[in-house]
From Swiss-Prot:
Highest taxon in the source lineage: Eukaryota
Keyword Zinc-finger annotated: no
Upper lineage: Eukaryota, Metazoa, Chordata, Craniata, Vertebrata
Example of a GO MF term: protein-containing complex binding
Gene3D superfamilies to which the protein is assigned, alphabetical: 3.30.70.330
InterPro entries: ALYREF_mRNA_export (IPR051229), Nucleotide-bd_a/b_plait_sf (IPR012677), PDIP3_RRM (IPR034784), RBD_domain_sf (IPR035979), RRM_dom (IPR000504)
Quaternary state and interactors: Interacts with POLD2. Interacts with NCBP1 and EIF4A3. Associates with the multiprotein exon junction complex (EJC). Interacts with RPS6KB1 (activated). Interacts with ERH. Interacts with THOC2, DDX39B and ZC3H11A; the interactions are ATP-dependent and indicative for an association with the TREX complex.
Gene behind this protein: POLDIP3
Effect upon mutating residue 385 to A: Reduces in vitro phosphorylation by RPS6KB1. Reduces in vitro phosphorylation by RPS6KB1
Phosphothreonine modifications at: 140
Record's keyword terms, sorted: Acetylation, Cytoplasm, Isopeptide bond, Methylation, mRNA transport, Nucleus, Phosphoprotein, RNA-binding, Translation regulation, Transport, Ubl conjugation
One of the protein's GO biological processes: poly(A)+ mRNA export from nucleus
Name of the molecule in the record: Polymerase delta-interacting protein 3
Keyword Ubl conjugation in record: yes
């Protein structure tokens, strides 16, 4: 039997069923017999219209369950999970990140009111009665106001006086006595009452020689809130102090005037000491000419607190972080990252070394403790190196210590081990 298409099979079955129904032409009226003849004549036209009206593929397409459920092709899911598209979505230009952050910060925020200390001082001066007479039964804690005079290290090589001297002054402000002027020669009995505030002056070097007739001078103090003020005195120069004295913490101050003279010592040439207060500097090169200083500040302030950030000239910027860890984080985040289509080249200045953009592996080496020990070693050995010359180390000794061997042949003795179970 030859292969028959589905359309022909349906057509033959339909024709056979109609032939069986109309097999007895004598039964029925005239209209039925006329209808048989007309049906036989128009059978060919009916099959053509039937073929046009019905197609099995149309019926399958209408009742397809996949269309109702919304089943997607598995290849589309694979394309969505492709790692290359994820990488393209995550890596973006730093300018896009700046723009998105600016859009997020367009919401108006209430300006934070920063209270000036001078306003508080004036308010406190205008109403001293509230502070002079504290309520009975309450204990007022001792508030300390410290003023530090910072001496620049650059002028440390020019001592003014051959005998450096130290001076410590402690002045007690007693609100119950309602006095603002105190003499330094005042007896201890006059200030035996409980102090509510305490002010400390710390000075070093030849400052004592400029204070002639200090006992007759008087110090005026105002009623102020607890406040720490750092004043840079460029006019004051002091002799260089050893590193051990420089880093030594100040001890408790007494109420007496202490004058301590030290014998002059010949100090070695002072090395530049990297203070943590200076921060960690990072320079950014290869910037687009349209990058401004505001862009630099907004870009790097995300990584941590900035000491300063400025545009040296178009294409080069300088950023100084307060903490070293923040500078390392910014270096790892923005080194060789594109800003306005140009990769940023970051150079990190740390521990006296410069880590360029092509040497990120030096970050791991610069933070190792061995580097710190090597940098601190010359400072400790300076005093001893002048008297004793450095000892020469034999390379055979180093080989023997490291590999238990040397250049020459060494006789090895067998080692016996006794193990008790």
């Amino acid at each position: 039997m030859a292969d028959i298409s589905l359309d022909e099979l349906i057509r033959k079955r339909g024709a056979a069923a109609k032939g069986r129904l109309n097999a007895r032409p004598g039964v029925g009226g005239v209209r039925s017999r006329v209808g048989i003849q007309q049906g036989l004549l128009s059978q060919s036209t009916r099959t053509a219209t039937f073929q046009q009206r019905f197609d099995a593929r149309q019926k399958i397409g209408l009742s397809d369950a996949r269309l109702k459920l919304g089943v997607k092709d598995a290849r589309e899911k694979l394309l969505q999970k492709d790692a290359r598209f994820r990488i393209k979505g995550k890596v973006q230009d730093a300018r896009e990140m700046l723009n998105s952050r600016k859009q997020q910060t367009t919401v108006p925020q209430k300006p934070r009111q920063v209270a000036d200390a001078r306003e508080k001082i004036s308010l406190k001066r205008s109403s001293p009665a509230a502070f002079i007479n504290p309520p009975i039964g309450t204990v007022t804690p001792a508030l300390k106001l410290t003023k530090t005079i910072q001496v620049p290290q650059q002028k440390a090589m020019a001592p003014l006086h051959p005998h450096p001297a130290g001076m410590r002054i402690n002045v007690v402000n007693n609100h119950q006595a309602k006095q603002n002027l105190y003499d330094l020669d005042e007896d201890d009995d006059g200030i035996a009452s409980v102090p509510t505030k305490q002010m400390k002056f710390a000075a070093s070097g030849g400052f004592l020689h400029h204070m002639a007739g200090l006992s007759s001078s008087k110090l005026s103090m105002s009623k102020a809130l607890p406040l720490t003020k750092v004043v840079q005195n460029d006019a004051y120069t002091a002799p260089a102090l050893p590193s051990s004295i420089r880093t030594k913490a100040l001890t408790n101050m007494s109420r007496t005037l202490v004058n301590k003279e030290e014998p002059p010592k010949e100090l070695p040439a002072a090395e530049p000491v990297l203070s943590p207060l200076e921060g960690t500097k990072m320079t950014v090169n290869n910037l687009h000419p349209r990058v401004t200083e505001e862009d630099i500040v907004e870009l790097f302030c995300v990584c941590g607190a900035l000491k300063r950030a400025r545009l040296v000239h178009p294409g080069v910027a300088e950023v100084v972080f307060v903490k070293k860890d923040d500078a390392i984080t910014a270096y790892k985040k923005y080194n060789n990252r594109c800003l306005d289509g140009q990769p940023m080249k970051c150079n990190l200045h740390m521990n006296g070394n410069v880590i360029t953009s092509d040497q990120p592996i030096l970050l791991r080496l610069s933070d190792s403790p061995s580097m710190k020990k090597e940098s601190e070693l010359p400072r400790r050995v300076n005093s001893a190196s002048s008297s004793n010359p450095p000892a020469e180390v034999d390379p055979d000794t180093i080989l023997k210590a490291l590999f238990k061997s040397s250049g020459a042949s060494v006789t090895t003795q067998p080692t016996e081990f006794k193990i008790k179970l």
